[in-house]
């Protein structure tokens, strides 16, 4: 009997730790409701049920398309308006909770959801680009790049997940992205202070 009780206790502790490490937890959903209201809680439930659980067995391409479309429904707003800062990398939780953010926030949200879905971080790059708007204005921008093959030689082997275009397209089809400034390897390469701060905030599920 004691052995059974001990085994049950070990399983319970292990399960609790595993749930705490999940991208979306019940505690997070309830905390989001307290801070932002029912809409925010329902959005996190949607991530967990529709995306993480619903796409678990889907192809990688389908995961990219569905996650990209879901995240792009969030409203665009500058860091100055939302956080009173010129540049701020919001967590997935802040971005979804507030239901607004800028281009980096879309990239961060897509990255972490796709990572939770089993997409290798080595395939995903935070990519700084110059974007040409419909009016012809050149703007600094960030998109998430997905590498179909390691060290791609062709633009057709890089898929772009951006917030200015709701479709996932090969880089060769994104004529509005006129120059790549640099690519960041996410959590697989050298980490900047900004990245380390984001990781710490994600770990504590900062809302």
Range-by-range predicted roles:
Residues 11-19:
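Hydrophobic h-region of N-terminal signal peptides that target proteins for export
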Residues 18-207:
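A structural boundary/capping signal
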Residues 2-10:
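Sec-dependent signal peptide recognition
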């Amino acid at each position: 009997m004691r052995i059974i009780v001990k085994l049950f206790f070990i399983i319970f502790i292990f399960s609790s730790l595993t749930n705490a490490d999940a991208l979306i937890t019940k505690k997070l959903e309830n905390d989001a409701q307290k801070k932002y209201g029912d809409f925010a809680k329902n959005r996190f439930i949607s991530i967990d049920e529709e995306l993480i659980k619903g796409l678990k067995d889907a192809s990688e391409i389908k995961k990219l398309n569905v996650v990209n479309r879901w995240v792009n429904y969030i409203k665009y707003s500058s860091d100055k308006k939302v956080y009173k800062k010129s540049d701020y990398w919001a967590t997935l939780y802040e971005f979804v909770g507030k239901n607004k953010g800028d281009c980096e926030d879309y990239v961060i949200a897509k990255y972490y959801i796709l990572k939770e879905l089993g997409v290798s971080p080595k395939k995903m790059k935070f990519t700084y680009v110059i974007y040409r708007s419909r009016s012809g204005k050149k703007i600094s921008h960030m998109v998430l790049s997905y590498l179909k093959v390691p060290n791609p030689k062709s633009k057709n082997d890089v898929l772009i997940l951006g917030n200015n275009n709701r479709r996932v397209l090969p880089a060769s089809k994104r004529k509005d992205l006129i120059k790549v400034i640099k690519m960041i390897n996410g959590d697989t390469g050298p980490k900047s202070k900004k990245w380390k701060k984001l990781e710490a905030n994600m770990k504590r599920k900062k809302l």
